[in-house]
Regions:
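Membrane-water interface segments at the C-terminal ends of transmembrane alpha-helices
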Residues: 1-128, 156-177, 181-184, 196-229
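Intervening/peripheral non-core polypeptide segments
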Residues: 110, 118, 147, 151-152, ...
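Short alpha-helical segment that forms part of, or immediately flanks, the ligand-binding pocket
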Residues: 77, 135-136
């Protein structure tokens, strides 16, 4: 009975995907669709480079900080995670000024702000799985902090880092509210989906929606599966 209930629950969660097979007329690509894909993938990729470059040292610092300081930093990071996207977009526009709006820079900066908290918090959780004693021993053997990270810390925590990065990727790629305020142009996939829906209806949305889902969902799903497999291997 419990298995049947769980099956129904799972089907209910997946039910929205059935909308991809709804008969709404012939699908068609609209002008600017491919540009929206290029904008989203290219600028989100750049945003992720910045997130990793800034977020990894921050995660290392917070993970090794005294408990009280760690709590404070985690609270600060949670603010960036919990801040409503529309409010964040307005605040960024006010903070950076009107010249900032509707530029590639605005697009990337907004994506960094909406996603870096997810990456840092996930990376902190990954780093907490690394025994501190191993890092100390590596340091005593003469390895500098950079060498300790690459030889000891990262190999143990790499799947956790991958999960954190995949969550940040999805968060940045799918952001709509903040991007709508700060960078309506250049139009990425979320904004293009919305404008196509408003202007042309569902048939114009579905092709881009399929690409959107195909670029957003596989990475976190794969990272989660690999992390679970590794956990099961360690338990065995």
């Amino acid at each position: 009975m419990q298995r049947f209930g769980a099956l129904l629950f799972g089907l209910a969660l997946l039910f929205p995907l059935a909308g991809l097979f709804a008969r709404v007329g012939p699908w068609h690509w609209t002008n600017g669709t491919l540009d929206a894909v290029r904008v989203s993938l290219g600028l989100t990729g750049l945003a992720m480079v910045i997130v990793v470059a800034l977020g990894t040292p921050m995660a290392l610092y917070v993970a090794r900080a005294p408990s009280r300081e760690r709590i404070i930093w985690q609270a600060v990071l949670l603010v960036s995670v919990l801040l409503p996207p529309l409010a964040l977009g307005i605040l960024l526009s006010l903070a950076f000024g009107t010249r900032f709006s509707n530029t590639s820079l605005a697009f990337v900066v907004t994506q960094v702000y909406v996603s870096i908290g997810y990456y840092v918090l996930g990376a902190i959780a990954a780093l907490e799985t690394v025994p501190r004693s191993l890092e100390v021993q590596a340091g005593l053997l003469g390895h500098d902090p950079w060498s300790v990270f690459w030889r000891v810390t990262y190999p143990i925590a790499r799947l956790g880092f991958a999960v954190a990065l995949s969550l940040a990727w999805v968060r940045a790629l799918t952001e709509f509210g903040a991007i709508l305020v700060t960078a309506y142009y250049p139009a990425g996939m979320p904004v293009a989906i919305w404008t196509n829906l408003e202007n042309f209806g569902l048939p114009a949305v579905l092709p881009l929606l399929v690409v959107f889902l195909a670029t957003a969902l596989p990475l976190p799903w794969l990272a989660h599966v690999l992390a679970q497999r590794r956990a099961l291997t360690h338990r065995a």
